[in-house]
C-alpha cells in the first residue's frame, strides 16, 4: 500500500495536563469529530475510549499513554493521551520523547497547576512545541485571562491568546478568532452547528486590544514582521499565521485557545490550530544518533528513502495479541514480517505484525513510513528506549532517561501458588514500566517493589491481582533513602590470604571525593607504572560498585561519589580479580570512617490548596513535618501553599488534611531532589536498620 498521508500532512502530538484538567475528555472529542468514534464516552461515567484499563475506568484517571490515530481535514494526527497524575510522569516523559508537538490542557478555573509545571518543564527539556487549550470554560469560576496570566507568572511562557471566549461559565457561547477577527457562535449542544459571524459590538474593543498584543508578540520573534509592525504597515492574516507557526515550532511562542471539551465547544478550532501551528516531522531537526560501525554521531532525517530507524517508547501486554511494542519511525519504512536490528541490545528481531492503535482497538497494517507511530507484535528482547533499525545501517538513537523510584513496599504472596505467579507478573510489569523496580532483599528474602508514589504502586499491585490473578499482602510504604560522602578522603584496602597452595592478594589505595548531585558514581584509573596491572582495574571498579549498593551507615545505596584508584600493589602468583574486588570493597568501608557519610532523603514539592480559614492549620502541618513553606498565593477564596517536605513525613497526609479542612483541602506532591536528613533523624534510621556504622 502506498503512503496515505504525506509527511507535511502528518502530526504527532501529545495531550498533556494536570490531573482532572479534562485531557481525556478533550481527546475523546477529537476522536468524535475526526470520525473515529460514533458515541462519546464520558470519563466520569467510566466509559472513555482512551482509558482502557479497568483501573483507569474505575479511578477516572489516565495511567498509560494510549496511542491513537485520527484524520482531520486531510491530515493524519497521531495522538498520545498522557496521564496527568504525578506518579505517572514516566509515561509523560517517554511520550514527549517521540512527539513533535503537544497540546497543553488547562482547567480555566485553576490555570497552571503543579503537575502542569512538571510536564511543561519536561516538554521544554525535550524542546517540544506546544499550543495551550484553556478547557472547562463552562465551569463555575472559569477565567480565561487568569489562566493566560498564570502561564506568564508560573511558567514564564511567552504565551498569547489567538482567540478569546465570548462569556464564561454557563454564558460561554462562542469564541472570537483574533486572526480572522470573526466570532464563532455555538448554536447546539454537540458543537457541530457553528455560525461564523462578525464580532459582537460589546466585544469588539477587547478583541482589538488582544489582537494588537498578539501581533506585537509575534512580530518580536520575526525581523521582517517587526519592521512592518514598526513602520505601521498592515500585517496580513497569512503573514500572521506563518509567523505564529514559525515561532511555535521554534519553541519561542505558545498560542492559547479557549473551549469546553465537555460542552463540545472549541475542539474543532483547536484541531485546526494543531494543523496550522504544530510541526510536521519535516519541521523538526533530524534525530541524532551514534553510528555503531564508526562510533560517530549521525542523523536520521524524516525521509522514506533513508535507512529505517525507530525508537521503542512503550512495551505493554495486550490481553489478545500478547506483547506489544509501540515505536516511532524516524526514517525509512518497515514492512511486517521483516527483520530489524535492536541496536541497543545488538540483537536481531523479527517484526511479526504491525498494528495501528485506536485506544484499545487495533487495525493491522502491512507497512509503516517515516513519521508514523505504530505497535509491533512479536518482539522478544526490545524494551523501552531501545533503537530498532535497518540491519545494514545500525544506529543507536538518543534513549529515554528515567527517574529513580522514591518509594518502596514489601509484597509477599498469599499462597504457594501465588508465589510462582508473582515472579512472572512482576517481571512483566517491570518490562512495561521502567520507573518500577523489583528487588529481593538478600537478608530477609522478601520481595520489595519500588516506584514513583503510593498511587503508582497501588495500581501495579491491583494489576497484578486482576491481570495475573496473584493475591499478595502489601507492607507499609517505605522511603527509598540514599547515602553519600560529604568529605574527601583516601583509604587503603588490602586483602591477603596465604593458606598453603595458591593464596589471594589484592591491594589498592583509593581517593574518594563527593560528586555533584545526580551525577552518580564516577571511577578514575590514575595508576602509573603498572603497580596494579591493567587486567585488574575493572575488578576494582566492580568491587566498589557492588559494595556501594549496600551503604556504610544503614545499608542504603551510596550515590554521587568519585573514586580515583591511584596506588596499590600485586603478587605475581596470588593476585586475581576476586582479590582486587574484595580489596576495593575494603577500601570503601575504610573510607567511611573519615568521609563524613550522611543519609539522604527524597524531598517533595508539595502544593496544598485550602479555604483561607484553614491557612494557620496548614502552616502548622508543614512545620511539624520538617517542611518549609516556599511561597503562598491567593486564588479566589482559596490559598495555595507551596512547600518542600520530606517524603517520609507525608505518608497518610491525605487523611490529616481531610479531617483538618472538613474535606475541603486538596494537595499534590511531586519528587524534587534528595537532601541530607537531620542528625537526629539519621540516628533513628540507623538504629531502626540495625546500623552498619
Curated annotation (Swiss-Prot):
Chief place where the protein resides: cytoplasm
Protein name per Swiss-Prot or TrEMBL: Elongation factor G
Keyword line: Cytoplasm, Elongation factor, GTP-binding, Nucleotide-binding, Protein biosynthesis
Pfam assignment, any one: GTP_EFTU
Reported function: Catalyzes the GTP-dependent ribosomal translocation step during translation elongation. During this step, the ribosome changes from the pre-translocational (PRE) to the post-translocational (POST) state as the newly formed A-site-bound peptidyl-tRNA and P-site-bound deacylated tRNA move to the P and E sites, respectively. Catalyzes the coordinated movement of the two tRNA molecules, the mRNA and conformational changes in the ribosome.
A GO term for molecular function: GTPase activity
Residues annotated for GTP binding in this entry: 17-24, 81-85, 135-138
Localization: Cytoplasm
GO cellular component, one term: cytoplasm
Limits of the tr-type G domain: 8-282
One record GO biological process: ribosome disassembly
HAMAP family in alphabetical order: EF_G_EF_2_B (MF_00054_B)
Lineage: Bacteria, Bacillati, Bacillota, Bacilli, Lactobacillales
Protein family: Belongs to the TRAFAC class translation factor GTPase superfamily. Classic translation factor GTPase family. EF-G/EF-2 subfamily.
